[in-house]
Amino acid sequence: MTAILERRDSENLWGRFCNWITSTENRLYIGWFGVLMIPTLLTATSVFIIAFIAAPPVDIDGIREPVSGSLLYGNNIISGAIIPTSAAIGLHFYPIWEAASVDEWLYNGGPYELIVLHFLLGVACYMGREWELSFRLGMRPWIAVAYSAPVAAATAVFLIYPIGQGSFSDGMPLGISGTFNFMIVFQAEHNILMHPFHMLGVAGVFGGSLFSAMHGSLVTSSLIRETTENESANEGYRFGQEEETYNIVAAHGYFGRLIFQYASFNNSRSLHFFLAAWPVVGIWFTALGISTMAFNLNGFNFNQSVVDSQGRVINTWADIINRANLGMEVMHERNAHNFPLDLAAVEAPSING
């Protein structure tokens, strides 16, 4: 009888724990995805802060030329970064216990792998937690779907691209100037500016900014007057009020006359779906583009496409970009290569004797 009571007590304890984890009454919703999200994001954040401040230089290219990335080793907020794991490690899983010592682990850039893998797990669980909370509250699941765009983008630059290139050393450094360096080298090696999926991503980001500004300014300009001239217009809204706070008919009429009638939404629901979908689909395509270029399916090559009747090349913008690409490729990893791969011989010279 005692054993039965103990089992019931443990079931009740487990039941109370489950109820607490999945309760929507908590100030911050935890959820089952949160059980994994919280420790992974805390780990990634803690190691990032410590490494950004104090990590020793990392042999990123695997040629015994360490690169400094932390504040205590001469960097500032702009130049500092978590240097990617060494090319000598490649794609190997490199936890602390795989190294002979902590010094070796730091020298080979172990913190980068630790941060990136925990971060990707954490943001994926954050997306799952968004779906989970929506499910508990009886909401539709599109918040998590929208968040999948930045998750896909992060996964592309931190995981898919290194896999395609064969080494975590090709992943994006965790810093401001490191991000710019990654972008420049990516252009040099993959001609991303000439990739249609990147173009769709640019349209998504810039278009999303434009549509957000248009929507916000239209709504703000067509508020229903509830205040005097001496009060802020924001005081005319009360949280949870049933009536509309702006006149959508006026906004529709204004924009329809500014552009043309069918350029203006007359359905608030379809309008807000469009505002969400446009940037999300654009970033999806960019992430897909990074993931294909990871395996060297690169942007369009229109170099020397135009020639005159004598066969002489007439330079186009594509040729100007190509010259810039070659210059950027020559300059990056300058001690690891004698010349850029694009200029290498197609066949190795034969060796006699």
From Swiss-Prot:
Pfam families, per database record: Photo_RC
Keyword Transmembrane listed: yes
MF annotations from Gene Ontology: chlorophyll binding; electron transporter, transferring electrons within the cyclic electron transport pathway of photosynthesis activity; iron ion binding; oxidoreductase activity, acting on diphenols and related substances as donors, oxygen as acceptor; oxygen evolving activity
PROSITE patterns: REACTION_CENTER
Residues carrying the site annotation Tyrosine radical intermediate: Y161
UniProt-listed Enzyme Commission number(s): 1.10.3.9
GO CC terms, sorted: chloroplast thylakoid membrane; photosystem II
Site (Stabilizes free radical intermediate): H190
Residue numbers of N-acetylthreonine PTMs: T2
Subcellular compartments: Plastid, Chloroplast thylakoid membrane
Phosphothreonine found at: T2
Prosegment location in residue numbers: 345-353
Binding site for pheophytin a: Y126
Binding residue positions for chlorophyll a PD1: H198
Transmembrane segments: 29-46, 118-133, 142-156, 197-218, 274-288
HAMAP family, per database record: PSII_PsbA_D1
Note: 2 of the reaction center chlorophylls (ChlD1 and ChlD2) are entirely coordinated by water.
Protein name: Photosystem II protein D1
Lineage: Eukaryota, Viridiplantae, Streptophyta, Embryophyta, Tracheophyta
Gene coding for it: psbA
